[in-house]
């Protein structure tokens, strides 16, 4: 009984903390849409804000789904309703659908701000304007939109219909397009630039390399013929961590070093920071 009560409290906590994501997303969208300074149009904004805007859309639309899911889990455990648990007559695959409908967009909540940070760092240390500003901005919105259409690729071996598997596979490959647009535009920004390899730039370059590996391994998981063999293997773990650690963490560390002098008024030690960037890589 005590163990069951602990789970109910955990579900309650998860439900309540979801409001922080929803309200933060609303705050960012309202701020970006209504509180830009005079003269700043949509295409005058920093690309980091485009990434934050796309992230906020995901937070507002995806978080309520996981909130409903944990609420149903609470009701099921408290009143023995048959929703997800087979012993009560529920369907665990339904839980998978609800869980992944939130949890796949959630990885884009983590990676999109990192992409925005890289889009800010590269033009500064390549000493030339970002290449393809509008393409990068629109690709952030495209990633946010497509992120809601691919959750079934986590469930290729769960007993879905062949048609559903085919559509989810196709849509998963499609999300590589706006991602590749970013990679190619970042590379074009570097081309013929006067590159300074300061610490933020090292993290940004590390992001591009490691994230590209993560993206390419994702193509093998998107393809039905290879996914059925790779599901539940360390290949999936490697793909995820190349994207989340090689991507998100590298970008966030780069952003911390990039904005640290502006935030604190103090410069970080360049030698030790470069060494840490190489060690993290």
State where each predicted segment sits:
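Membrane-embedded and interfacial regions of multi-pass energy-transducing membrane proteins
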Residues: 1-281
